[in-house]
Amino acid sequence: MKTLLKSIKITLVFCVFFSVFYILVLWLFAQVAGPNRGNAEVVTLNGKVVGAANVGQTFTEEKYFWGRPSCAGDGYDATSSAGSNKGPTNPEYLAEVEARIDTFLIHHPYLARKDVPAEMVTASASGLDPDITPQSAYVQVKRVAQARGMDVEEVRRVVDKAVEKPLLGIFGTEKVNVLKLNIALEELKNR
């Protein structure tokens, strides 16, 4: 009986620790050290809120850069954040990826199949990834420039400015926030 009571006490202590104290410590750390104090980075255009930089959005128009596909609900639904849970050998998953590659190539006919970045046809684990690699942005430059009637080099320079370096130069990889990149293009158009 003593062992059972000890086990129950230890379980309760760990439940309280991990469900309250640990979460509180992480939240406090984010408030002190995290970018935007651990809160959403709201993005505005012409004084109107258009999204959050840390949650991906669906862009489908030719004039915008596209992010990664999402498996979160009906496209970037933060309440349904999750991957598809389909493995890389699952026939349904392989068919989805093949269909995404075909669609990507229709909109980027200047690319060879082997040049389609994997991240542009596979969803992230959360389904809410707001960033793409610089490579994934650069392969879209020609399409976006044509759709906007802009010079390819001008759009490339916008992408160059949008590339974010790894945190402290060592944590993570270079990335491009798709929403911020599209906002930069809209602001360029409004000048």
Swiss-Prot record:
Claim: Transmembrane is one of the keywords in the record: yes
Subcellular localization(s) per the UniProt record: Cell inner membrane
Membrane-topology annotation of the record: Single-pass membrane protein
Transmembrane parts of this sequence: 10-30
Keyword Cell inner membrane among record annotations: yes
Annotated Pfam families: KdpC
Gene Ontology CC: plasma membrane
Chief place of localization: membrane
Keyword line: ATP-binding, Cell inner membrane, Cell membrane, Ion transport, Membrane, Nucleotide-binding, Potassium, Potassium transport, Transmembrane, Transmembrane helix, Transport
PANTHER family cross-referenced by the UniProt entry: POTASSIUM-TRANSPORTING ATPASE C CHAIN, POTASSIUM-TRANSPORTING ATPASE KDPC SUBUNIT
Family membership noted in the UniProt record: Belongs to the KdpC family.
Quaternary context: The system is composed of three essential subunits: KdpA, KdpB and KdpC.
Function of the molecule: Part of the high-affinity ATP-driven potassium transport (or Kdp) system, which catalyzes the hydrolysis of ATP coupled with the electrogenic transport of potassium into the cytoplasm. This subunit acts as a catalytic chaperone that increases the ATP-binding affinity of the ATP-hydrolyzing subunit KdpB by the formation of a transient KdpB/KdpC/ATP ternary complex.
Alphabetical list of NCBIfam families matching this protein: kdpC, PRK00315.1, PRK14002.1
Protein name: Potassium-transporting ATPase KdpC subunit
Species of origin: Bacteroides fragilis (strain YCH46)
Recorded name of the encoding gene: kdpC
